[in-house]
């Protein structure tokens, strides 16, 4: 077999492949064995028609398409290897010659990976992120943890305040007419949660139990119910009950409840500070890496094939479908609720898809330029890390993946990202007051 590659305009080229006649004849033999089982010829049992009779009756041409189907996949794969091209989409194939006793010749218009012209990726100016944990951040984390242990207590006296949970009855109307879904009794609402129409919760602040009030709000222009979007509504509202969160004091006992390894408040704070400091350092490093990736990608010039963007869009839509499925929705239901269709969703995602493709191509090109590879030791370390993270054995991970190619590529790219950050020039950011 022979193959030639002729680069055309942009990221396309013409792959011309010639398969020797010997293989063509073998493929025709295979095609005949398949086709003969499916035809009826008077005087012969099904599947027992001699080849000469078959060709006399139907012509050898009746076998050509099946022979092409047999020859094409392997021939195309071998041609890709021989010419060392990297297709990014299915080719457009045109058969030039298929005939018994002659070579099989076909042409394939192939879109290949684009040329990547790297710009500067070392010495990038990156903003140095703050890693020191402040006392305020520690206290905020403590308050957040104590908040999970808070109990809701009925407020006997007093008024509704931000953070309280109120039990209310309400009836909404637009232009004096009640609308569907605008009425409820015994509804619990946390003030400040932002779960109601903008302006509603704030107007309940200062109200007392058994007090009634007309709450006037305007539905957002982008409200999902088109008949209400942008309209002013009045909600006749009554407060039935007010509850507030009673947060426990941080004692040695509570500290142990929050952290089994801490027996005192001081031990709890020390352990928490250590964990938060480690997380802040990790988060800071990740932000710095993201900035380095973005700048290296921005400095790179690539003519990205539309086929690669479409493939990435397919992946992103699939990821989106999986996310909303976890919320009990499927894509069609989401489209009905949102008023979008898949075309609009893909258009909305297109810029991100292009950026993803450009980033991946940039990082891969840097890996090649720097001759960065993932060693067996690197892969073993990553497998051990995954084993601890997901609490499953290394062997089970290998069996699930089938091979370690994905891990190998991930580790390789992570090494590139480390290189970008390690070679960056850090500058101090402007601290906010």
From Swiss-Prot:
It holds the Pfam family Trigger_C. Residues 163-248 form the PPIase FKBP-type domain. Keywords: Cell cycle, Cell division, Chaperone, Cytoplasm, Isomerase, Rotamase. It catalyses: [protein]-peptidylproline (omega=180) = [protein]-peptidylproline (omega=0). Its EC number is 5.2.1.8. GO terms for cellular component: cytoplasm. InterPro entries: PPIase_dom_sf, PPIase_FKBP_dom, Trig_fac, Trigger_fac_C, Trigger_fac_C_sf, Trigger_fac_ribosome-bd_bac, Trigger_fac_ribosome-bd_sf, Trigger_fact/SurA_dom_sf. SUPFAM superfamilies: FKBP-like (SSF54534), Triger factor/SurA peptide-binding domain-like (SSF109998), Trigger factor ribosome-binding domain (SSF102735). One of its GO terms (molecular function) is protein folding chaperone. It is found in: Cytoplasm. Consists of 3 domains; the N-terminus binds the ribosome, the middle domain has PPIase activity, while the C-terminus has intrinsic chaperone activity on its own. Belongs to the FKBP-type PPIase family. Tig subfamily. Involved in protein export. Acts as a chaperone by maintaining the newly synthesized protein in an open conformation. Functions as a peptidyl-prolyl cis-trans isomerase. This is Trigger factor. The gene is tig.
């Amino acid at each position: 077999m022979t193959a030639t590659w002729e680069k055309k305009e942009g990221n396309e080229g013409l792959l011309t492949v010639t398969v020797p006649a010997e293989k063509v004849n073998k493929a025709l033999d295979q095609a005949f064995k398949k086709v003969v089982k499916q035809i009826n010829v008077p005087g012969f049992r099904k599947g027992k028609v001699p080849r000469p009779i078959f060709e006399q009756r139907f012509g050898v041409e009746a076998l050509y398409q099946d022979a092409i189907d047999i020859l094409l996949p392997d021939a195309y794969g071998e041609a890709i290897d021989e010419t060392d091209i990297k297709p990014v989409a299915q080719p457009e194939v045109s058969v030039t010659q298929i005939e018994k006793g002659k070579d099989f010749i076909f042409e394939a218009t192939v879109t290949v990976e684009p040329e990547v012209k790297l710009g500067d990726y070392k010495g990038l100016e990156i903003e140095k992120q703050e890693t020191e944990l402040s006392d305020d951040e520690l206290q905020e984390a403590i308050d957040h943890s104590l908040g999970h242990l808070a109990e809701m207590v009925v407020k006997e006296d007093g008024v509704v305040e931000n953070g309280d949970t109120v039990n209310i009855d309400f009836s909404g109307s637009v232009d004096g007419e009640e609308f569907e879904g605008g009425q409820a009794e015994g509804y619990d609402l946390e003030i400040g949660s932002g779960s109601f129409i903008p302006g509603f919760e704030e107007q309940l602040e200062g109200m007392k139990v058994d007090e009634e009030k007309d709450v006037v709000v305007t539905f957002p222009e982008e409200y999902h119910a088109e008949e209400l979007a942008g309209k002013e509504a009045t909600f006749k509202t009554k407060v039935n009950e007010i509850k507030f969160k009673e947060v426990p004091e941080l004692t040695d006992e509570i500290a142990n409840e929050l952290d089994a390894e801490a027996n005192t408040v001081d031990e709890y704070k020390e352990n928490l500070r250590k964990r938060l400091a480690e997380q802040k350092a990790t988060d800071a490093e990740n932000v710095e890496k993201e900035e380095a990736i973005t700048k290296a990608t921005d400095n790179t010039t690539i003519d990205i094939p539309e086929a690669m963007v479409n493939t990435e869009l397919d992946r992103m839509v699939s990821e989106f479908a999986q996310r909303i499925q976890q919320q009990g929705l499927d894509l069609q239901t989401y489209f009905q609720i949102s008023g979008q269709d898949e075309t609009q969703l893909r258009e909305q995602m297109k810029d991100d898809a292009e950026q993803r493709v450009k980033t991946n191509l940039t990082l891969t090109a840097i890996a090649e330029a720097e001759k960065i590879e993932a060693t067996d030791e690197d892969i073993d370390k990553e497998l051990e890390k995954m084993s601890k993270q997901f609490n499953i054995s290394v062997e089970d991970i290998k069996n699930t993946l089938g091979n370690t190619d994905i891990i190998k590529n991930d580790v390789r790219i992570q090494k590139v990202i480390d290189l970008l950050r390690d070679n960056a020039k850090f500058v101090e950011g402007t601290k906010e007051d």
